[in-house]
Amino acid sequence: NSPQQLAQLERAFQLQQANALMVQGVRLADPGRLDVRGVLQCDADVEIDVNCIFEGKVHLGEGVRVGPNCVIANAHIAAGAVIHAFTHIDGEKLGVTVGEGALIGPFARLRPGAQLGAEVHIGNFVEVKNSTLAKGAKANHLAYLGDATVGERVNYGAGSITANYDGANKHRTVIESDVHVGSNCVLIAPVTIGAGGTVGGGSTISKSTEPGALSVARGKQVSIANWKRPQKTPKP
């Protein structure tokens, strides 16, 4: 067979799978723009937008919405979850679980071992790897959670990361329930942030904190009055 014939056969096979899903009640924005490269199981009232790819074993629970241009592999997406556009979910060997009513993306990345509870929010340009997030935890912008255990109702600020690798071994970060982590924080594992605590924006935390404590670890601000900026040297 020529590459052209193989491509035509693949398109016919994919359309066959799309039609079978629609017979089951799945709503596809365009059956001609769907790729199922494994086993896709859909419960009632599922919607899938265009240009989505499903690999390995994927289960979409009742009422799940998948936005355009998503890639989902080896994952269980529970009822009522919404996967916004351009989200990449790769369960590989460890799998990925997204809880009921969770909101993921757009432009989010869930890597192997990501286990998200009900009503978790993972926003744009957030990466989660080998981490557990309990009900209602939120990381909405530009963040990294690797090898972490995150409690209920945690708010994880924009630009914050868990520093989980010391150059030789991976270490775990524990963020207990009701913690607020400010923007641009670094949590150097192994470390535990106590329940109800607050981490001030811009802090680098290398020691565990007590429950309910405010933890701030950053350089003192210095403001120099009447500062004159360097001037460009004229080109010869």
Tell me what each language-model feature is:
Residues G32, R37-V82, T87:
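Phosphate-binding active sites in nucleotide-utilizing proteins
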Residues N1-R33, R37-L40, D45, G80, ...:
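Terminal amphipathic alpha-helical/low-complexity segments used for targeting or macromolecular assembly
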Residues Q14-Q17, N51, E55-K57, N69, ...:
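A signal for specific C-terminal beta-sheet/loop modules enriched in small/flexible residues
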Residues Q5-A7, F13-L15, V26-R27, G32-R33, ...:
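A short linear-motif detector with a strong N-terminal bias
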Residues S2, I48, V154:
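Residue-level signal for inorganic ion chemistry
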Residues N74, G80-P236:
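Glycine-rich hexapeptide-repeat left-handed beta-helix
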